[in-house]
From Swiss-Prot:
Mutant lacking the gene: phenotype: No visible phenotype.
Keyword Kinase: yes
UniProt-listed Gene3D superfamilies: SH2 domain, SH3 Domains, Transferase(Phosphotransferase) domain 1
Annotated EC: 2.7.10.2
Keyword Lipid metabolism: no
Active-site positions on this chain: D354 (proton acceptor)
A GO cellular component annotation in the UniProt record: cytoplasm
Subunit record text: Interacts (via the SH2 and SH3 domains) with DOK1. Interacts with KHDRBS1/SAM68 and VIM.
Subcellular localization: Cytoplasm
GO biological process terms, semicolon-separated: peptidyl-tyrosine autophosphorylation; positive regulation of TORC1 signaling
Protein name listed in UniProt: Tyrosine-protein kinase Srms
Length: 496
């Protein structure tokens, strides 16, 4: 009788409760009291957001406004998102996900199942930004310690990360997702939504040792066109080397972002052309080219800021103990990667002018990226000329460029042939023992560098083609890329 009446006449549930009191095992869930009753309201056990799993099927949205008629009910407004904790006949005991955390009973007829929505309307959610960009945002003058944001995770597809400013640094926390769909920072602390997670850690911030005070203010100049940055944003930490354009340093941007900083003396630069040249360079994007981050051209010295590659330049790396242990497939892989980058520059009609192993950078995973493309054009004519002696890299430069300053994609091809020689000699200097003058003299007489001991014969054939006296007879980078890739494939097939 009881189950039948409770199911058919749910609107008299308060009356059935008087006739058939609830079992003690169910006292933790408040039941509806009638309008005429005046019970002493029970204090429902506080529902911690972390105490319940959050399967996606238990998310609801309020279809209509509902005003609670007693302490056990929960008032909701149309559009409110709720998480169902337990079904109670024609009611759902739910937790409201928007606004102050609260729980109570809501009639099922007032609700509809909802699907999780990306929190794009929240001021603390930043979509489409990376970890490095989050650091820039939070460390900007507009944001103080305690500023925070949530962003999509870079390492976990569909996941999130919490980034919080703590004085002069930014702390990042991965927000994990349990199989049930719950979110957590710490195991055992489960939350049905990002709102609930933030609400909990705003109160219990000591668990992550950083208070969550206010959402990040998105007014940092992170627009891609704003390349000019104040020099004060960069700290030079360790000198990595020195080349024709100045010194290269490992540095930190905004106190936490590792970067490479090329320091150039203004006396050697055509500063009037710098902005125009940077405008051209920043449009070049390829996985085999170093990414340009920023420039500092106001005052002296000029900074050109790029991404940092862990193993430094290719010439130095090849001469290291780790580099000397590399096998032929690795060396050929370097050649193929550089050819890919140069082929892209060729398609964009960009002339490098200073292609050499010292201007190719190596990552921790042995990826190669071409650097300093186009910068030689910024050097003053009296600096980058044969008469200036050591400033011009004669041993890497095509004869027509070294003698007459005729630079082209085909003069880059000549330099690529010299780079191949460096790769297959593990960083050895070309024309060793010769002066610049002697080098040019010998080249004009037909001398070409010999085949390195570990260099495959078919690769050396490509080197010699790169060193044709007539630029028109030299291959394009597109052809070099295809031929090197073909040699690489045959080598790997032979090894397997």
């Amino acid at each position: 009788m009881e189950p039948f009446l409770r199911k058919r006449l749910t609107f008299l549930s308060f009356f059935w409760d008087k006739i058939w009191p609830a079992d003690e095992s169910e006292e933790d869930i408040p039941r509806i009291q009638g309008h005429d009753d005046n019970p002493v309201p029970e204090q429902a056990a506080a529902v911690e957001p972390c105490s319940f799993p959050a399967p996606r099927a238990r998310l609801f949205r309020a279809l209509y406004d509902f005003t609670a008629r007693c302490a056990e009910e929960l008032s909701v407004s149309r559009g409110d998102r709720l998480y169902a904790l337990k079904e109670e006949g024609d009611y759902i005991f739910a937790q409201r996900l928007s606004g102050p955390p609260s729980t109570g009973l809501v009639p099922v007829t007032y609700l509809a199942k909802a699907t999780p929505e990306p929190p794009s309307d929240q001021p603390w959610y930043f979509s489409g930004i990376s970890r490095a960009q989050a650091q820039q945002l939070l460390l900007s003058p507009a944001n103080a310690p305690g500023a925070f944001l949530i962003r999509p995770s870079e390492s976990s597809i569909g996941g999130y990360s919490l980034s919080v400013r703590a004085q002069a640094k930014v702390c990042h926390y991965r927000i994990c997702m349990a199989p049930s769909g719950s979110l957590y920072l710490q195991e055992g602390q489960l939350f049905p939504s990002l709102d609930a997670l933030l609400a909990y850690y705003k109160t219990n911030w000591k668990l992550i040792q950083n208070p969550l005070l206010q959402p990040c203010i998105p007014q940092i100049p992170l627009v891609q066109d704003e390349w000019e940055r104040p020099r004060s944003e960069f700290v030079l930490r360790r000198k990595l080397g020195e080349g024709f354009f100045g010194e290269v340093w490992e540095g930190l941007w905004l106190g936490s972002i590792p970067v490479a900083v090329k320091v150039i003396k203004s006396a050697d630069m055509k500063l009037a052309d710098l902005t125009k040249e940077i405008e051209a360079l920043k449009s070049l994007r390829h996985e085999r080219l170093i990414r340009l981050h920023a420039i500092c051209s106001l005052g002296e010295p000029v900074y050109i800021v790029t991404e940092l590659m862990g193993k430094g330049n290719l010439q130095v790396y090849l001469g290291s103990s780790e580099g000397k242990a590399l096998s032929l497939p690795h060396l050929l892989g370097f050649a193929c990667q550089v050819a890919e980058g140069m082929s892209y520059l060729e398609e964009r009609r960009v002339v490098h002018r200073d292609l050499a192993a010292r201007n190719v950078l190596v990552g921790d995973d042995l990826t190669c990226k071409v650097a300093d493309f186009g910068l030689a054009r910024l050097l003053k004519d009296d600096v980058y000329s044969p008469s200036s002696g050591s400033k011009i890299p004669v041993k890497w430069t095509a004869p027509e460029a070294a003698n007459y300053r005729v630079f082209s994609q085909k003069s880059d091809v000549w330099s690529f042939g010299i780079l191949l020689y460096e790769v297959f000699t593990y960083g050895q200097c070309p024309y060793e023992g010769m002066t610049n003058h002697e080098t040019l003299q010998q080249i004009s007489r037909g001398y070409r560098l010999p085949r390195p001991a570990v260099c495959p014969a078919e690769v050396y054939v490509l080197m010699v083609e790169c060193w044709k006296g007539s630029p028109e007879e030299r291959p394009t980078f597109a052809i070099l890329r295809e031929k090197l890739n073909a040699i690489n494939r045959r080598l790997h097939l032979g090894l397997t």
